[in-house]
Design a protein with these regions (language model features):
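Beta-propeller blade termini and top-face loops
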Residues: 19-516
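Bacterial Sec-dependent N-terminal signal peptides
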Residues: 1-20
């Protein structure tokens, strides 16, 4: 038999939960302590370095862990943004006055687990203190550009809300260091600004990519008539659309890059019916389609980074599913071999030290990696505990254990206390994929782990063997529809009962061996 999900009751539960209010007094004298884990880290959205100190000072923006700073080239990090919104979309360092930093909140890698932001912040003391300086309603910020000649002029690319129309989208400009803002380019309420480039030799020349998108509960539409590539030659007063050589509309997201050493050389990855790589040799006036691998053109809505070497227009890097590079200005790309060891897939940020361009830092769904040989080998930067937990549970042992699933980093468990404190070595992996629900069984020897699409396993903690236990449809049943984040829980009154939900609610009383 099936226990059908009661939609009305589920909706009532959501409404009840929405009315709960939390305040600091509910925690009394309890203080939070950091348990980690830092062994796998989490999604990195932005990396910026300070040019003046040989790249020793780094700022790392994360999808759900705020901003972190290193003053020793990534050997260690400290959190500098705990009091504010933890979803970071963009960072910018004023290289003329490197104590001035801008942080745009609201990640712009528009997947189904993205969090919105609350505006843009400014620090004038290298991240010790921050002040919100506006753009409260844009929700997501994808790029911040500081004018290379007049650092009071700042441009902000705002894709805008993920789930709804909004007039607070587009390209914003400040001429007074962020004290006030003007929306200088706007298409419509469904289209925002995804990327912006200032010509370093003539910063009145601006290239922007506009992006129409909308996420729904069960789908994501990346693209529409509002998307396109535009150019301004007067500092953002007027814009004209660039079309020559680009594919037929509609477009989705467009990633753009300009060579700092030769601003005539540009590359763009254009999401369309036939997503492709395009090259320009005249500053973006005309474009030519280039053959490129699936990895180079993969998922532009999620992989939107394309970077030229600061000093060499022939060297280009494309972080995506994997890391790719070009030695001929983007005419061809090669996939990195990772001779130095594994690097986490799903890559979103890359900062290259302009004084030593062999040194670079790569931001992935699994943290930050450093290379000193142009991306041939990589070293993982430990000590960034910014993993994104979807769900957390615990058992009743002494000390009790903590269980949880992390975005793109599997499912893990660790004791709540250990001699000398909890370290990375105390965390043990019990599942793969995008870890979601991770639930201990009442027998104390078993844990249930689940990853995307309702794929669930029973794990024996004594020998770490796992067995697939997802309920399967019979010939008389409808095709089962599993959520990306599928709930799996044990019974409150009878912990021997295990419940999972597709469009039906299933129960098992034998650890998932059979279901009804």
């Amino acid at each position: 038999m099936f226990i059908r999900l009661c939609v009305a009751l589920l909706g009532l539960n959501v409404l009840c939960q929405a009315q709960v209010r939390f305040n600091a007094g509910m925690f009394g004298v309890m203080e939070a302590r950091q348990l980690g884990p830092g062994t796998m880290s989490g999604r990195i959205t932005a990396i910026e370095g300070v040019n003046a100190d040989e790249g020793k000072t780094l700022y790392i923006g994360t999808a759900g862990g705020g901003i972190w700073k290193s003053t020793n080239a990534g050997a260690s990090y400290k959190s500098i943004f705990d009091k504010y919104c933890q979803s970071i979309g963009a960072l910018a360092v004023n290289q003329k006055q490197p104590k001035i930093i801008y942080a745009g909140t609201g990640e712009s890698n528009m997947r189904n687990s993205v969090s919105y932001g609350v505006g843009i912040y400014k620090s004038t003391d290298a991240g010790d203190n921050w002040k919100k300086i506006g753009l409260d309603s844009v929700e997501h910020i994808s790029k911040i550009c500081i004018h290379p000649e007049n650092d009071n002029i700042i441009y902000v690319a705002a894709p805008g809300p993920l789930w709804s129309d909004s007039k607070h989208r587009g390209l914003y400009k400040s001429v007074n260091g962020g004290e006030t803002w003007q929306q200088v380019f706007y298409i419509n309420a469904a289209t925002g600004c995804a990327d912006i480039i200032l010509d370093p030799k003539n910063p009145e020349h601006i290239i922007v990519s506009m992006w129409q998108f909308r996420r729904q509960p069960y789908s994501f539409n990346s693209g529409g008539p509002g998307s396109g590539l535009y150019k301004s030659t007067d500092g953002g007063k007027t814009f004209t659309e660039i079309t020559k050589g680009l594919p037929e509309k509609p477009f989705g997201r467009i990633a753009i890059a300009m060579a700092p050493s030769d601003s005539r050389q540009m590359l763009a990855i254009v999401e369309s019916k036939n997503t492709g790589l395009f090259r320009s040799s005249d500053g973006g006036e005309t474009w030519q389609n280039q053959s490129a691998s699936l990895n180079v053109c993969a998922r532009p809505f999620y992989f939107s980074t394309l970077v030229f070497d600061p000093n060499d227009a022939q060297r280009v890097y494309r972080p995506a599913f994997q890391f790719a590079y070009s030695n001929d200005g983007g005419y061809s790309f090669s996939e990195a071999s990772y001779d130095g060891g594994w690097v986490h897939s799903d890559m979103h940020a890359l900062w290259i030290n302009p004084k030593h361009t062999n040194i670079m830092y790569l931001g992935t769904d699994g943290g930050v990696y450093m290379s000193v040989d142009n991306g041939i080998t990589w070293q993982f930067n430990h000590g960034l505990p910014v993993g994104q937990f979807y769900h957390v549970s615990y058992d009743l042992k002494t000390p009790y254990n903590i269980y949880g699933g992390l975005q793109d980093n599997g499912s893990w468990m660790a004791p709540s206390a250990a001699p000398g404190g909890i370290g990375n070595g105390n965390w043990n992996r019990v599942g793969g994929g995008d870890g979601f629900w991770t639930i201990p069984d009442a027998d104390g020897k078993t844990v249930y782990s689940e990853y995307q699409g309702g794929n669930m396993y029973r794990v024996n903690l004594q020998n770490m063997k796992s067995e697939f236990i997802q309920p399967q449809k019979t010939s008389k049943e409808d095709k089962l529809r599993w959520n990306w984040n599928t709930p799996i829980v044990t019974g409150a009154k009878n912990p021997q009962h295990l419940y999972v939900g597709a469009q039906y609610l299933y129960v098992s009383n034998n650890q998932g061996r059979t279901w009804k």
